[in-house]
């Protein structure tokens, strides 16, 4: 198993709030909690940047992290990430922040310690671009949106 350095910036993590964990043995994402000092009221349509109290240094250029919304919050409450998906590069060392967007029509209360997002580590392949004047033909060619059908 690959180990990633994580720095706890908020002393409540591991004491008042649990350390990030995988909820089940089959979970792909580590739950991320909001580490604010007070509850946050998010009005309809409002976005806000909230701290997680954690910094991460992946260090391996063949890995990145993606910050993804928790599905229940978006479906049931209209609370999603303002940037939809956050990409954490391997050389970033700052605090993980969550851009939270209330796309519902009612106020939403976020309490300190609430799980609002999840972090998934993914492989990265950096490519070298090869400039060509033509592509080798393929069966699909340049067929785009809907070209391959629905069935």
Curated annotation (Swiss-Prot):
A GO term for molecular function: dUTP diphosphatase activity
Q: What is its EC number?
A: 3.6.1.23
Q: Which UniProt keywords apply?
A: Hydrolase, Magnesium, Metal-binding, Nucleotide metabolism
Catalytic activity as recorded in UniProt:
dUTP + H2O = dUMP + diphosphate + H(+)
- Enzyme class, spelled out: hydrolase
Pathway the protein contributes to: Pyrimidine metabolism; dUMP biosynthesis; dUMP from dCTP (dUTP route): step 2/2
Instruction: Outline what the protein does.
Output: This enzyme is involved in nucleotide metabolism: it produces dUMP, the immediate precursor of thymidine nucleotides and it decreases the intracellular concentration of dUTP so that uracil cannot be incorporated into DNA.
Q: Which HAMAP family match?
A: dUTPase_bact
Q: Please identify the protein, giving its name as recorded.
A: Deoxyuridine 5'-triphosphate nucleotidohydrolase
Origin species: Hamiltonella defensa subsp. Acyrthosiphon pisum (strain 5AT)
